[in-house]
A protein has these predicted regions:
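Conserved redox-active cysteine motifs that mediate thiol-disulfide chemistry
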Residues: 83-91
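Thiol-based oxidoreductase modules, predominantly thioredoxin-like and allied folds used
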Residues: 79-82, 106-120
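Bacterial Sec-dependent N-terminal signal peptides
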Residues: 1-25
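Non-catalytic, surface beta->alpha helical segment in thiol-disulfide oxidoreductase systems
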Residues: 137-173
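N-terminal leader/targeting and pre-domain segments
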Residues: 20-72
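Conserved helix-turn-beta segment immediately C-terminal to the redox Cys motif
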Residues: 69-77, 94-111
Length: 176
């Protein structure tokens, strides 16, 4: 009986450690690495350095947001960003504000924070992340497209995302 208890205890501890490695934690440079949520960015130093101001001052396009409310149904998003990256610091708060105004279900968003080598304890593997931020949009498990680093064709993040989720041909800035 003791052996079974210790075996179960070791399995529980092992699974907790495995899960812990995926949650975003600060590395030696002070950057988050792992799976992050908005709450991570609302803490210091990120809140006062960039998140709160960008979120507050970003003005979305109301007409595009109205269209996105319908188009985002059934969409899941996998995002990659670096807390060290100026483009990520600009786009992540804007992205959250856009999703808030579009009534997006945040259970369908997974955001991975990467280090300066664009690595996150293996969470980035298989996604070919070359620039951050990168948002990958999926419908029924199929990739529809990616928003990479900055707005491209439409001049705003919401314009580019609307094009992607509307399944209109779209190329991000680094796509040939």
């Amino acid at each position: 009986m003791k052996k079974v208890f210790y075996l179960l205890l070791s399995l529980v501890i092992t699974s907790c450690v495995a899960t812990k490695n995926k949650v975003a934690i600060k590395n030696q440079d002070g950057d988050l690495v792992g799976i992050a949520t908005r709450n991570d960015f609302k803490k210091e130093p990120f809140a006062s350095q960039w998140f709160n101001d960008y979120y507050e001052y970003y003005q979305t396009d109301p007409e595009t947001v109205t269209q996105l409310k319908q188009k985002l149904n059934g969409i899941t998003i996998k995002g990659f960003m670096g807390t060290w990256c100026g483009d990520s610091q600009r786009e992540i708060p804007n992205f959250y504000k856009l999703l808030d105004e579009s009534d997006f279900d945040f259970k369908k968003l997974e955001l991975v924070t990467v280090n300066r080598k664009k690595q996150a304890n293996g969470l980035e593997k298989g996604y070919n992340i070359t620039h951050v931020p990168t948002f990958i949009f999926y419908k029924e498990g199929k990739e529809l497209g990616r928003f990479v680093e900055h707005a491209n064709e439409n001049g705003t993040i919401e314009g580019d995302i609307l094009k992607i989720v509307s399944e209109i041909p779209y190329k991000h800035p680094y796509q040939k």
